[in-house]
Design a protein with these regions (language model features):
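A membrane-topology feature that recognizes alpha-helical transmembrane segments
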Residues: 1-197
Length: 197
């Protein structure tokens, strides 16, 4: 019961942040995306634990701004990164899994950013997901490789659908798009996969 209460508070806080920012015109208001964010936060509040719910809220908020503005705000991910490192130190998760298992995924993410596969905001979200999986007792090596692979496929499907809709509306095809929603969908799918298996 307490978990659901904390998760609901986190979800409501995330929606208040989004709606206040949209009301003050700090971010673009999009009713469809706002409804999608509210739905994602509501579903997340029932299935995630309280630590994962904080990450989920940040992913949903970043997805909203990435779709509506093609921009990621870095304050929340950086704050979450500090929280993940503090969690690692306080709960001593580094004793369960050696820190060296984070070298390969970090190098993989940095290399992908250098070849401009990701923006700096996407890279920070990926690093937070890597830290979170490490703190949950999951080795980031295998998880991040499969996560990046599935995210790439989800993003490709998203871009195909976006361009097909654009062709129907007689718009010019686009080659860049919002990557944070693909990361959010992939995180949800991989969580369900792990939860159901």
């Amino acid at each position: 019961m307490r978990r659901y209460l904390i998760n609901t508070v986190v979800a409501v806080a995330a929606m208040i942040i989004l709606s206040k920012a949209a009301k003050r015109e700090l971010i673009v208001k999009n009713n469809i995306c706002m409804a999608g964010a509210a739905s994602a936060l509501a579903v997340g509040s029932f299935i995630f634990d309280k630590y994962t719910m904080v990450l989920w809220s940040v992913l949903v908020m970043q997805s909203y701004t990435d779709i509506t503005e093609q921009h990621l705000y870095l304050m929340l991910p950086r704050l979450l990164a500090v929280m993940e490192v503090a969690y690692c130190l306080v709960h001593r998760t580094y004793l369960d899994i050696p820190l060296s298992v984070m070298i390969f995924p970090a190098v993989l993410i940095a290399a992908a950013m250098l070849i401009r596969a990701y923006t700096i905001g996407d890279m920070e979200l990926l690093l937070i997901i890597m830290l979170h999986t490490y703190n949950q007792g999951i080795s980031p090596n295998e998880y991040m490789v499969s996560y990046l692979s599935v995210t790439g496929m989800v993003f490709a499907v998203y871009m195909i659908v976006k361009n097909v809709i654009g062709m129907i509306k007689h718009l010019v095809p686009v080659w860049k798009g919002a990557f944070a929603p693909a990361m959010t969908v992939t995180y949800f799918v991989m969580f369900l996969w792990k939860y159901l298996s």
